[in-house]
Amino acid sequence: DQVTAENLTAMKERFADALALFPPGYHFDVIGYGCTSASLLIGEDTVQAIVKSHVNVNNVTTPLTGARRALKAVGARNIGFLAPYISEISEKMCFLLEDDGFEI
């Protein structure tokens, strides 16, 4: 498959299948969903809600969540952005970071 916004968004439909692979009844402190671009398109809150609805976990994170929090924690204002994503994804990511108050 090609990397497209449509294919990345469709990952949401397979979360339940993937999450069913975790040991039933096991409690996790944190689960990380490792697809930055899908997290952007699906939405960080939606990713967290889906994971928490299928797995006993305290926290859910994504690379996007971590990057946003880290940039805020170090007081970043002006950031350079380099990413291996298709332009549609890169633009959306830049818009999100700008909405967070960063200058790109």
Which residues are covered by each model-predicted region?
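N-terminal glycine-rich anion-binding loop in soluble enzyme alpha/beta folds
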Residues: 1-17, 82, 88-104
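Ligand-binding pocket scaffold of soluble enzyme catalytic domains
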Residues: 1, 26, 33, 67-69, ...
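Phosphate/pyrophosphate-binding loops at sites that engage ATP/ADP/AMP, CoA/4′-phosphopantetheine
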Residues: 18-27
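Short, acidic/small-residue loops that bind anionic groups at enzyme active sites
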Residues: 48-71
